[in-house]
Amino acid sequence: MDAQATSLTIALPNRHAERRWLPAAWSGLLIVILSFLILYPTAMLLIGALTTTNPVVEGYHLADLSIGNFLKVATNPNVASALGNSLIACGGGTIVAVVIGLSFAWVVVRTNTPWKGLIASAGILPLFVPPLVAGVAWSILGSPKTGLLNLLAMKAGIPFHIDLYTMPGMIFVFGIYYAPYVYMFTAAALRNMDPSLEEAAEISGASAARTMATVTFPLILPAIISGMLLSFVVMLGIYGVPAVLGSPANISVLTTYIFT
């Protein structure tokens, strides 16, 4: 009788199958933590705005619901003035940021200028400077009485006077320090743009200016708008620059008004 060899297959446990629940568990834990850190403070802020009492100390009661706080804010002339100043400062700063950021992007991407790497680094350098430091630095340079630029101009006999403790001063500093947002968006759009489109326009007889106006600019316009919106929103939340440059001139924006 011939002996027949039989093989026995043993199914080993699939470690990967056993650990499939780990990503879901970590995702769920992360969602819970983020919900607590974000949703809970936001909910308490909303409840506090809709009640006339402190919900943390006195508890939350439906009878305390009121829009009185919103009416006080809406009818406060100081809030309206601060809001108007914020829109002017941030709107003007956004325009300056677009001019500077677009110029830097065009020079870096579309020209053969030397030291392009240095220029590209300078284009994002303001992002590494805290707003409060930026305000103090420019106040040292542009103070109306003791500013370094004014003192140098006085010694040189140049009829030059600069005062950054003004609305144009804030707009100027805002534009310089938040131009990198426009620069990064626009430079990326210029690099990723299909050059054959501009070549086709030139072959068709379009001038460089017409090609820029009808081909290049429409293609990078979404990037410019994205940089503008981001710059504007970030400027609205900045405290350092308005506190240093606006407060001495009694120019109050929303961020400084909240802290006063």
Question: Which positions does each model-derived feature cover?
Answer:
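Short coil/turn motifs that cap or connect alpha-helices
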Residues: P114, A206-S207
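Transmembrane alpha-helical segments of polytopic membrane transport and secretion proteins
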Residues: M1-I31, A209
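Feature of multi-pass inner-membrane transport and sensor proteins
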Residues: D2-T9, D194-P195, R210, S247-T255
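Glycine-rich helix-loop "coupling/hinge" segments at transmembrane-helix boundaries
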Residues: V57-G59, S143, G240-T260
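Transmembrane helix boundary and interhelical loop/hinge segments in multi-pass membrane proteins
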Residues: A63-S66, T186-E199, A208, L221, ...
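Glycine/proline-centered hinge or cleavage motifs at structural transition points of membrane proteins
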Residues: S204-A206, P218
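Membrane-water interface segments at the C-terminal ends of transmembrane alpha-helices
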Residues: L22-V56, L71-R191, F217-G240, V244
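A short amphipathic helical element positioned immediately N-terminal to and/or at the very start
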Residues: A11-N14, L65-A74
